[in-house]
Amino acid sequence: MENISPRLESELRRVAKGPSANEKPGGIGTVRFTVRCPIGTADVLAKAKSVLEAVDNATLAGWPSNEKAAPQLPQWFIDRCAPPITQEEAERQLAWRKSLPLEEQNRLRNETDWSLDNWLYWMEPSNRQWFWWDAKVLEDYDHIALAIEVEAWPFPWGALRWLFRAAGASAVEAEE
């Protein structure tokens, strides 16, 4: 596995200050998202940043191989996550979902709360395929313009969606 530390350090800087004027994204570039927030757009953005900072700092300290460096996540995020389920229950839910029409499967994928363990799995360095690039709360709007640096397209971004939904967003949509 590549050394992810420089990438996380850059991500932490961009979370705090945005990209520098001459900075170019790595991978294949950026993918843009619209994050819809019914209320408290600035608060949603601040909450999402706080969780990502906790994960990045824990990873730089040796997580997940060093369990003592586990992310110190905000309690609101932990409380917002779904309780863990057994393997048997997960298999039963998966079989049920696969029996549904595709449109309903997609709706459930977008609306179902994630467990903390599932979310952390996708935030482990070996599973991360997206990194924060930039985000702006648009004036007089109820949404955030978000740019994410990606390695390839398509890429799994359910953990990104859950990060913002847990923070209070009503929807996260990739721009076409």
Listing of model-derived features with the role each one plays in the protein:
Residues 2-161, 165-169, 173-176:
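Structured alpha/beta or helical-core interaction and ligand-binding surfaces enriched in interleaved
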